[in-house]
């Protein structure tokens, strides 16, 4: 449940973000929740398989977003982009393939690895969360693609954007191939008897139909809401502000943290430093001053008395101490 709820909450956050890197970051958090959910469903091999395939297409998407940011003069707001498919066709196509992999379109790596997680969840209520997250993933990724790569350029950066040099798009091409071919390495992921990791689609399976239905639902909603749009048609503050977790952290966690820090500072400053360290020093100095005043007072008789007392103590400890 921890993985499932994490996956759902992060996916909802991603639906209202405008920063291209934040969308992918919350998407990554959501997919990590997917993997943890698989582990909780006693299917760690399915989680590891999704981790393996996810590494390829998410690396493709992050590098693609970096290419877009570079071409748009460091602009990261997707609403200030637009029309990049014509200006950056290689980057746009590779980004689209990465999007298709993430959204589990058949014959891409994400389709096979997500199917294994759905199989693991088929007898659990988490199946509905998994399918819902799949629909949300399709929604926010095609929202990103429709806004940033289609339509018209909305800002100077996207108007002057051009395809990145070969040293930047060549890795995108390699990762695109890996995003498609990586499922065929599933034989290297041993099973434990609960879920069989496979790269062969089961198109007649109900779970596959649910997965395809989730993709279709997310795509249709993204198309209806964002295709050809120049501004945000809906605003959900709860999702846009990330369930106010940052504010909660600042108001509660930070206050508690500051209180504990103040207490520790007081203990260190006044107890350890003031009483123990400085107190011991002042005590030693005080005792030393007392003895100094008594022993070094300039009186010859006092010196003789102390010398005699010292001699008596030496004789006592030498002769009688044993």
Predicted feature locations:
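Membrane-entry segments of alpha-helical transmembrane domains in multi-pass membrane proteins
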Residues: 49-52, 125-130, 205-210, 296-304
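Hard-cation-handling environments
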Residues: 161-219
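Alpha-helical transmembrane segments of multi-pass membrane proteins
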Residues: 102-107, 180-187, 223-224, 314-321
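Hydrophobic transmembrane alpha-helices and their helix-loop junctions in integral membrane proteins
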Residues: 1-163, 178-184
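Hydrophobic alpha-helical membrane-insertion segments
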Residues: 98-102, 171-185, 257-266, 313
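Hydrophobic alpha-helical membrane-embedded segments
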Residues: 58, 135-143, 214-234
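Hydrophobic cores of alpha-helical transmembrane segments in multi-pass integral membrane proteins
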Residues: 134-136, 176-180, 211-221, 253, ...
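Aromatic-capped, Gly/Pro-kinked transmembrane alpha-helices
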Residues: 192-206, 231-322
